[in-house]
């Protein structure tokens, strides 16, 4: 399911919930007209059985914000019970579009719409916002709570992320370089997939796939998103970390926006900001 919003759309200064969308954040003053290349965003989510209401609300607020900044956006949802296949099909749809950037958003993630502008403005090949896993380290939570004064329920989150140098994390304007990170809120430029297609021609998928109740061949269908198992080490890598590895192996770089609040919804709403977790960030 796909629908587009172009820069000619008209919106009110208030969003659909009647709240003023101007939060005073500097990124809201970003003049996209000064960019050399026109941004066209492809917002996509692999789904299975439904989406979280908080995800829907954040998506609608993002739509309003992008319209104000005259950034065209295509929204694309695909139903797949296999997350790797879902991500590959989303990527295929992006490559068939004329969009310049693809934004992966998992359907259990709630985000601040301004963080998307922050990632676009960073102008990186790949930039993501890390979100907490659905688990709490209570020993860590206790220590951070005692040191920071924050409530224990807001501490002790675990963020699945690997740094280039864990002992020397350099952060500028909330953006820092990483080795691996989650794909549930990840912005990727088109040129990333174009380069990966050149470097990994063996990943081309040629078989037919069920789409819209029909078996058909899919254009630009690549197995960029797949899990990885190291037989020698006996270690498993999820499709997002494995994707990051593919990109860095051919010289690419990955960045994270660590200064944005994001919520991972489940039985409990895990809301956090990586920079608050007592990490060494300078």
Go through the PLM ranges and name each one.
Residues 77-79, 130, 258:
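Residue-level recognition of beta-strand->loop/alpha-helix junctions
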Residues 3-20, 24, 28-29, 36-39, ...:
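C-terminal catalytic/acceptor-binding lobe
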Residues 88-101:
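Active-site nucleotide-sugar/metal-binding loop of Leloir-type enzymes
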Residues 38, 97-100, 124:
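Active-site acidic short loop of glycosyltransferases
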Residues 2-80, 85:
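N-proximal low-complexity "stem/linker" segments adjacent to membrane-targeting elements
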Residues 101, 126, 254:
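Short, Asp-centered acidic motifs that coordinate Mg2+ and/or phosphate
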Residues 91, 112-226:
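Conserved catalytic core of nucleotide-sugar-dependent glycosyltransferases
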Residues 99-110:
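Short beta-strand-to-loop acidic/aromatic patch adjacent to the donor-nucleotide binding site
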């Amino acid at each position: 399911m796909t629908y587009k919003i172009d820069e000619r759309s008209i919106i009110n200064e208030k969003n659909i919930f009647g709240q003023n969308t101007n939060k005073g954040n500097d990124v809201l003053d970003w003049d996209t007209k000064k960019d050399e290349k026109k941004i066209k965003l492809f917002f996509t989510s692999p789904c299975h059985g439904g989406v979280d209401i908080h995800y829907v609300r954040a998506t609608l607020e993002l739509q309003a914000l992008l319209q104000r900044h005259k950034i065209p956006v295509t929204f694309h949802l695909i139903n797949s019970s296999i997350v790797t296949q879902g991500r590959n099909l989303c990527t295929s749809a992006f490559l068939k579009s004329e969009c310049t950037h693809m934004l992966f958003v998992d359907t259990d993630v709630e985000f601040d719409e301004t963080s998307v502008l922050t990632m676009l403005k960073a102008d990186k090949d790949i930039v993501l916002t890390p979100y907490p896993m659905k688990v709490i380290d209570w020993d860590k939570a206790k220590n951070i709570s005692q040191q920071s004064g924050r409530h224990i329920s807001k501490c002790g989150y675990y963020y699945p992320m690997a740094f280039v140098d864990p002992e020397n994390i350099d952060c500028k304007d909330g953006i820092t370089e990483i080795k691996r990170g989650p794909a549930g809120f990840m912005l990727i430029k088109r040129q990333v997939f174009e380069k990966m297609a050149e470097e990994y021609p063996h990943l081309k998928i040629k078989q037919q796939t069920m789409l819209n109740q029909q078996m058909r061949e899919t254009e630009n269908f690549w197995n960029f998103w797949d899990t990885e198992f190291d037989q020698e080490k006996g270690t498993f890598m999820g499709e997002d970390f494995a994707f990051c590895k593919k990109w860095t192996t051919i010289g690419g770089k990955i960045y994270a926006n660590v200064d944005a609040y994001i919520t991972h919804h489940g039985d409990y709403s895990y809301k956090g900001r990586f920079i608050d977790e007592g990490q060494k960030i300078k």
